[in-house]
């Protein structure tokens, strides 16, 4: 398959009349898959109502079939066809954070979507992205768009169109290149099924921001039973991982430097994931800063690009610094723990 690529100059006034967006939307209506930017990461979109289209997402990514997909909409009016009545707290969150990096788990209307989208569950993960290109594409298609991250399953999510092309060129119909994404980590996923909502995946909207609007929420610590069906994307399987094994070190820079030397003595090429403040401290074979520790939003924005760079530099082992698990740091540490497969050095 030849993957078509469009380059779109993104502005807030981006029109659905843009001929490149029209071409991409036409492919979506033909039940093909198209990658496009959102404010979080690039998504791999398909018609959420058509099972054949959704199947192509799973095939292109190599994604397990019990991992549900997030449905993207461009207007609140689309909810009426897809979900049952939303709880009041969900409505409050929509008013405050949509469009934005917040995905809500809501009851799904019977037969409203392909069962491949919900992985057989009675709920659906749904959000409205805060990106002019994404919104224009969804509106032009006239469809709800199922879209996980546009990467091979298990690999770091794409924040640039080049990342998408690296993983999926020849496997999908098209890539809409709208430049790098802003937030850099996926949306926050919140289940509103209970009286007290449950945070299933930390992301671009922080726990603190949500609680400032609706009061206390619970935090899901992750599924302990791997045979359970996940109700949200990103709750199961290793994610976001470069090729080389990665471990998080919660120790001091001196401890990390000692580990570097220890692994190098074994003949391994060692990489370190750090921040601008400490990039000059380590004598590893490859040192990569993903942002400023004093401004964790920059770390989130640069995280996946940094993880991908370790593959390009062919390291054998990666040591990552740890971060505070508050604010957007909770999302950063969630992604690093997934990438590390839970490996932590203290």
UniProtKB/Swiss-Prot annotation:
Subcellular location: Cytoplasm
Statement: the UniProt record of this protein carries the keyword Aminoacyl-tRNA synthetase: no
Span of domain YrdC-like: 18-205
InterPro entries for the chain: DHBP_synth_RibB-like_a/b_dom, Sua5-like_dom, Sua5/YwlC_C, Sua5_C, T(6)A37_SUA5, TC-AMP_synthase_SUA5
Catalytic activity, as annotated: L-threonine + hydrogencarbonate + ATP = L-threonylcarbamoyladenylate + diphosphate + H2O
Gene Ontology annotations of biological process type: regulation of translational fidelity; tRNA threonylcarbamoyladenosine modification
Positions bound to L-threonine: 40, 72, 127, 147, 187
Keyword list, A-Z: ATP-binding, Cytoplasm, Nucleotide-binding, Nucleotidyltransferase, Transferase, tRNA processing
PANTHER family from the UniProt entry: SUA5, THREONYLCARBAMOYL-AMP SYNTHASE
Protein name: Threonylcarbamoyl-AMP synthase
Organism: Bacillus subtilis (strain 168)
């Amino acid at each position: 398959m030849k993957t078509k690529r469009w380059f779109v100059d993104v502005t807030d006034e981006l029109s659905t009349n843009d001929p490149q967006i029209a071409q991409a939307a036409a492919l979506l209506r033909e039940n093909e898959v198209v990658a496009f930017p959102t404010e979080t990461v690039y998504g791999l979109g398909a018609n959420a109502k058509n099972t054949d289209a959704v199947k192509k997402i799973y095939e292109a990514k190599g994604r397990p079939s019990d991992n549900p997909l997030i449905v993207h909409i461009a207007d609140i009016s689309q909810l009426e066809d897809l979900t049952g009545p939303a709880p009041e707290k969900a409505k409050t969150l929509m008013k405050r954070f949509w469009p934005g990096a917040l995905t809500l788990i809501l009851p799904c209307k019977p037969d409203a979507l392909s069962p491949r989208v919900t992985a057989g569950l009675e709920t659906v993960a749904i959000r409205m992205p805060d990106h002019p290109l994404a919104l224009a594409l969804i509106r032009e298609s006239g469809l709800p768009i199922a879209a996980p991250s546009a990467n091979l399953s298990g690999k770091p999510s794409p924040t640039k169109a080049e990342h998408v092309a690296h993983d999926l060129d020849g496997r999908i119909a098209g890539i809409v290149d709208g430049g790098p994404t802003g937030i850099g980590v996926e949306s926050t996923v919140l289940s509103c099924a209970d009286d007290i909502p449950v945070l299933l995946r930390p992301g671009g909207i922080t726990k603190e921001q949500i609680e400032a609007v609706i009061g206390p929420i619970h935090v899901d610590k992750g599924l302990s039973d791997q045979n359970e069906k996940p109700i949200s994307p990103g709750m199961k399987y290793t994610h976001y991982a470069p090729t080389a094994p990665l471990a998080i070190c919660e120790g001091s820079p001196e401890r990390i430097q000692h580990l570097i030397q220890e692994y190098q003595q074994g003949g391994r090429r060692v990489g370190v994931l750090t921040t601008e403040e400490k990039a000059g401290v380590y004598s590893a074979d490859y040192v990569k800063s993903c942002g400023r520790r004093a401004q964790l939003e920059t770390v989130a924005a640069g995280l996946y690009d940094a993880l991908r760079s370790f593959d390009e530099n062919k390291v054998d082992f990666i040591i990552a610094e740890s971060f505070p698990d508050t604010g957007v740091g909770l999302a950063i540490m969630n992604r690093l723990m997934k990438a590390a497969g839970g490996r932590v050095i203290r």
